[in-house]
Amino acid sequence: MLLRSPSYAGKAAQAQEGDAYGVYQLATLLIGMDAEDETSCLLAADALYRLGRLDDAHKSLLVALSQRPQAAPVLVRLALLQLRRGFCYDANQLVKKVAQSGDTACLQHMLDIFHHEDLQLLQDHCHTRALSILRARPGGSDSEAHTREAIAYLSLAIFAAGSGGSESLLVRARCYGLLGQKKTAMFDFNAILREEPGNVKALCGRALVHLALDQLQEAVDDMVSALKLDPGTVIPEILSLKTEVQLPLTQGLYTRCRVLLNQCLHTGVPLREEDTQGLLAMGKALIRINATQPSWRLLLTDILTGLGKYQEAGTHLQEALHLTPSSEAAQARQGLLQLKKGDVSAAVHGLQCLAERDTQDLGFLLCLLDSPERQSLVQTAAKEASNILDLGNPGQALSYCSLAILAGGNNPYHLRLRVACLTQLQEYDRALRDLDRVLQHPAEDSDLPRQSEDFCTRGRLLLSLGDKDGAAGAFTQALALAPAQAQNSLLEQPGQAMTASVFLIHGQRCLEEEHFEEAWTAVQNGLLVDPSHSGLKKLKLRTRKVATSGCRLH
């Protein structure tokens, strides 16, 4: 009867009073049968409280206390009555005994009996007392004892609050964190967030617990949610952390931004509004945490560029350039923003510095360009590369070639241009890889002379790498595609003598291995280049002589 809610349907104040009086009479009968029965005394005290007879309730509780001085259910009722009557010192002593007993759950059965305003008094008292204990908490071995005492008061405050004790839950969770009880702290943070999903302090607290449990992704998730809601609260929390704790968290935020940006740019799917908010919140927060970190400045520049906020992006880029004037990553972004303004030449100059240094970062920046911007960039970069190469500076031309290739998608013309640069720089392996990419493109009949020249170039590269057999094979393919053009090219380089020597050595090896048709082809190709070569003529005779009857030579 006492536990009925005040909002019980059709329940008038008079009826409630009647219930309480009936309970009191029943409790009095029970006490008459057994004066030492604590439950009956508590029932009588609760009924008297509901009847507004606080002094009589107090007397009833004193009787129960005399029989069991440490009974937490009696102590907490007495404390609440003393608070109601304004006797704060007495109430504090009683609450202290309850806290020391550890039986904070005794409040559970009182929530529907005592008036909300009285429970609020108890909650405020316990919460305030816990904060006082924590503020006065000493260092060393006594620190843990004070923290546990504060937890006991907070637990009373939480029970008294029912479902509205988020502040006490928050402080208790932090106390558990201080004691290293991470999972218990997580339980309290989760309890807050179930009722208040947007509680920023709880999100921050849970993020730090996740971090302590090596759950970095979950920590970043919570911190991002908090940053979107109230960066002004979150940033001081992060700044208050020790460096060894702050570092993985800020790095996690940085990485999350990069992943989101890359996913958006590479898939072509526009960012959702919540992702945009998260990116801006993270990017701006990192700057406020450490404005002297160049990579974070560049991150915010990229975020703003991706969102089309070029002027604001330029402002942050200038800060990055001020911090690290020689940064190639910053210079490349300056080039990108210049391209957005229509200055293609300046853009090419800025972006080419990454082409040979950091192709991954350059690839990211190129994704920020639309198709016409890319096309202009490719054409200008290729033209600049060709001009510089003509001036005899392959090292400088190389980065422009690479920019054209990365922006233009492995265009054969641009690849051949880079092959020429790499060959002059004697980077034969890399030149060969580029040329092989060219040769993977199917050739039309009109392209056969061009492809023949590609095989001549391939043979020369293999020759430079010491692979004479490979060179002979490439020269053979060139002669098969366009004989006259290939002969002229080979006579020019590597020259008549060297080309004939390559075919001679290859033919001799084929003959020794009894690959008669290959040997014959090598001899014939060698004599095309040098018809009077005595060694090749002798090899031709030997090949005819040793060839078996089953091998037809033409």
Swiss-Prot record:
PROSITE patterns: TPR (PS50005), TPR_REGION (PS50293). Signal peptide: none annotated. InterPro entries: TPR-like_helical_dom_sf, TPR_rpt, TTC34. The keyword Repeat applies. The keyword Repeat applies. TPR repeats lie at residues 38-71, 166-199, 200-233, 294-327, 328-361, 411-445, 452-485, 500-533. PANTHER family: TETRATRICOPEPTIDE REPEAT PROTEIN 34 (PTHR44874:SF1). This is Tetratricopeptide repeat protein 34. It comes from Mus musculus. The gene is Ttc34.
